[in-house]
Structures are given as C-alpha cells and as structure tokens.
Amino acid sequence: MEKRTNYPQLTEKQNHFFKLIVDTYIKTGASVASKELVKRCNLKCSSATIRNVMASLEQIGFLEKYHISSGRVPSTLGLEYYAKFLVYNPKKYFDQKLEDLLAKRRIKIDATLEEAAAIVSEVAGVTVVATSNNAAETMKSIQLTTLSELSAIVVIVTSSGRVESKIFNFENSDISLEDLRVAIRLFKERLVDTPLIHLANKARALTPIFGQQLKNYELILQKFIKNIFVFEEETTNKTFNKGAIVLSRNISREEIANVLDLIEKHSVWESIDNDLDEDNNIKLDVSRPNLSIISKKIDFSNEKNIKEITVIGPNNLDYGESFEALEMLEKIIKEKK
C-alpha cells in the first residue's frame, strides 16, 4: 500500500454527508442508499440531494457503486480519508483519562496488558496483536547455585522477568566449582544491564580480565558463550481473539491465511507503508479485501518489551473505538513499564 500524502479537497457539505455514509456502513455492514440515509439519520433534505452528493463522492473515488443494489460503499481511498480526517482525533482520544477509558470497559486500573487486550478484542469484535522484541532486554542478575559436588546451576534473570538456567557438570571437567564462582562474580561486576543479544560479545571482551584471575579462563568463557549467553534477537506476536478473523464470513480463505501468516511471523507495523499520524506513530492499511489494520508503534521501553500493538477487523470496524483501544492499551503498557 503506497503512502498517500494528498487527498481530494472536500467541501463542508461533502464531509458531513460522507461521514454519515461511512458511519452507516460501519453500523450495518451493507451498502448505503440515499433514501435509507435520509431516514436513518433523520436528515432535513431530499434523497435527491443525497444522491447528488454521493455521485460527487463517487466521482472523486471516495464511494463505489455496489453491484447488487442502488447503494454505495466507501472505497479504500474513502476509508483512509474517513479514518484520518473525520474520525481520528488525537486531542479527543489522547487527552481522556485512563480511568475513564478503563471504566468504560470494566477494566481495573491495574489490569495487565493481556487482560485488557483480551477484553477489548472481545467487546469490539476485533483481533488485537501485541508485538514484542527482545533487542532491549537486559540481564539483571546472574546467580550460581550448587546442586552437588559435581554439579551447579547458573540462573539468569532478565529485565522482563524471564528466567534462564543451565546446569554445569564438573565430572570429567577441567573447570572447578571455585573457578565457576569467580566467573559468576566477574560477570556480575561487568555484564549486569547488558542487552542479552550482546552478552556473548561482551563476555569475549572480558578475556584479559579472566586471564588475570583464572587458569582455565578460555575454557570457562567458551562454555558460557556457547551454552549460556546464546540469545538472538526475536520478534514475537501475541494474538487476542484470533477467531474474529478466522470465523469471518466476509474475508476469503486466502486472505485469512495471508493475515495469519503476517500476525504470527512478522511485524505488522513494518508491513504497512501508510502513516496515518507520524507524530503519534500510527499506521493504517485498508488495502486488503474486507480488512482494516491499524497499528501503533510503542517507542518507549517497558517490561514486556512491547514494540507495537495492532487492531485488525473488517472494513466496517469502528475506527473511533479502535483508536481509543490502541491508546488505552498503550497507556496500560506505560503504567507497567
């Protein structure tokens, strides 16, 4: 999807009626006819007036004629414009109190991200994806616990609360328990708060220091580099209410497979080219058949290493509610960082 910077200039009248048309489409999921709009919105104008406005909106590419009825549906371009200029309002959504947003959905102020995402996805009928990346995850502590005269366990606790452990056996080994204690002490002094993915390289840089205090320093360092400090950068997606996509009758099986591959294996944020709001790190994709994707980048450190949160739903999803949900989830992440 190409990043769009210029949109047709709409008059105040066109903006007003276009918003009503898309609002109605979102509520009904069906094409919108002029007579229906007059009746549903209690408009004080004729259906002929609405038809003329619809025709002008169709001419500039904001509406499309539905092939089995006289009504019209918003186009991809129209949905982009609606989301960016008629619904998305940072001041309205971003200035609301977190307590009000949580209370609205009966979520406690101390709710975890998982609890909030699960409830929001269920209530709104959308799929929520929380994407984490361990690039900034650090080692907070490294401990040695003796199991017996012939074995011990090395335990690493990370900044996200993750615990990694590895058993060392000393039988038929040139490494003694005392050597291991010295190594752990040096790692505590030199490697705490080091990103996990940099531990191996940082450990190699300690070779001169280890050489001054240990006889078998090369063997010890190699053991840690190959068996303990084996962390690679990983991006992980946690999905809530995946059934909203899988069970949808409006999305083709092929498109479902494509979206599932996206949310299970890739960064949703990086897959979208269209910035809805660069200042607030929000992207929008309505280019997929019967699908809308709104993704928000998380640019602050947090204990879960969350880097982006995404809402996925049909093209007639409630965009205003989706923006509000993303902002609420971002604030919960901030509360927990």
Swiss-Prot record:
One Pfam family matching this protein: HrcA
Which InterPro entries does its entry note? Answer: GAF-like_dom_sf, HrcA, HrcA_C, WH-like_DNA-bd_sf, WH_DNA-bd_sf, WHTH_transcript_rep_HrcA_IDD
Q: Which UniProt keywords apply?
A: Repressor, Stress response, Transcription, Transcription regulation
| SUPFAM superfamilies hit by this protein | GAF domain-like, Winged helix' DNA-binding domain
Q: Quote one Gene Ontology molecular function term.
A: DNA binding
Any one GO biological process? negative regulation of DNA-templated transcription
Instruction: Report the function annotation for this chain.
Output: Negative regulator of class I heat shock genes (grpE-dnaK-dnaJ and groELS operons). Prevents heat-shock induction of these operons.
Entry's family note: Belongs to the HrcA family.
Q: What is this protein called?
A: Heat-inducible transcription repressor HrcA
Give the species this sequence originates from: Metamycoplasma arthritidis (strain 158L3-1)
Name of the gene encoding the protein in the UniProt record: hrcA
